[in-house]
Structure formats: C-alpha cells, structure tokens
Amino acid sequence: MKIVLLPFLYLILSSTICFELPGDQKFEPPTPHINAPKGAFAKTVLLPGDPKRARYIAEKFLQDAKLVNDIRGVQGYTGYYKGVRVSVMASGMGMPSMGIYSYELFNAYDVDNIIRIGSIGAIREDINLRDIIVALSASTNSNYASNFNINGIISGSASYKLIKKVDEVVEKMGLQNKVKFGQILSSDTFYTDEKENDLKWAKMGVMGVEMEGYSLYLNAARAGKNALVLTTVSDHLIRKEYLTGEERQYSFDEMVIVALETAAELN
C-alpha cells in the first residue's frame, strides 16, 4: 500500500521546527502518576485507554511481561514481543489523562515512541465497523494547545517515522483494504446535546471521533519524540451501528498486532 504524505509531512516538519528545544521539560522518575523506576519502560510504549486492556495485551502478546506501574489502577507492563522490548500501559480517557501519561513517559522515562491503540466512532460512509484508522493528523475542539502559548493554531500530526513503519506492516499483513490513513477529531466531550456537530467534521475529510490523539501528538512534538494513533472503528455514528463488548475484544486484537509489529520494526 502506497500513500501520499506530503501535506501531512509539511505539518510534521513545521511542528518539529516550532518545538525543537524540549530540554527544559526533563525530570526524574518516579512521577506523581507513575511509580516505576528509571529504565522500567521500553523505548516504545503502547497506550490503550483501559487498564484491563493493558493487562490483556501483556498477558496474551508479550513474553516475560512484568508489572511496572499500578498507581490509581493504571497498570503498566514491560515485556518482549518477538525479542524486542515493548511496554504497554493504560492512558485513561480523554486528553487531560493522555496528556499526563504521555508527558511523563516522554520526559521522565525517556520513551521515544508512543502508539495509542483504542476505539473510534466513524463519521463517514466509506468507513466500516472494524476498520483500523491510522491518524495522520488530529483536529480538536479542545483548548489543549493553549498550554503551549503559541500565537496561532497548531496541527496535531503523527510522526513520519511511525507512519512509514506502520504502512510497511499493513502491507506485509495484507490489510490494505481494512486500514485507512487520514484525519481524526479528538473531542473534549463524549456526551453532547448537538451530536450532529461531530458529523460536520466529515465535510473536512475527518474519518472519525475519539478523545485522546491530539494531546498525544502535541506532547510528542514538544518533546521531540514520536507518536502515532491507531484506532479500531467500534461505533458508526451515521449508521447507528455498534460492536458488542465481545466483538470489540476480538476486533481489537488485529490493531494490537499491527501496533506490536510496528514496535518490533522500530528496533
């Protein structure tokens, strides 16, 4: 599968130029939200939202997985996938929670790559349940970027290094027809009186709505690190279609394998 990335590459490069001096953020572990010692996390960390999913991934896919964090019930594990050291930890729900955990992993634990793995609601007819969306960029209705005191609007963009690797993995796994590369919306709200407002984003090419990606992308840009958002379509907001809990678990395994294969390729 070959994709054209020039518009998004421009955004990524412009973000890197803006945030090329991350050194003032560095601090030592443990942090207020992670009780793991220095060196406990691998250079690549997978972040599902749900702590139970983090445990499930560690038990099913990692070898010699060790619990390295359990503060607030947010379980983090480090183990090996195909001989490559990989960590998995929950991020919680929403941009504030993702913002905290990704910030501390990048800046206190010297993690280089974070791959978010989670669910998304589709808002376009050409997207189907169980499709995997790779977020080249994340728009938002949040004011998360105001924390960076930028005189303008910054795009939340994936790292080209990770986009390239995941594209190679998708082709190798033969998932070209199921994996979609494009834009997502990171929303501040799950429940809203004006649900049709989310659907308006589809007119701008946005594929689906989730709640974490934008903060991850900005934290990665500010720290000079790499981030990627992988999501499985669990809900279709136009067709009113939804996966059951059992269907989610089975369907999400494919996305998890894509993320782990990408992590292994980064070694």
PLM segments and residue spans:
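Metabolite-binding pocket within alpha/beta catalytic cores that recognizes anionic/polar moieties
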Residues: 18-165
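Generic structural signal for well-ordered, non-membrane alpha-helical segments
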Residues: 47, 51-54, 94-98, 155, ...
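Flexible, glycine/charged-enriched surface loops at secondary-structure junctions
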Residues: 63-70, 174-181, 266-267
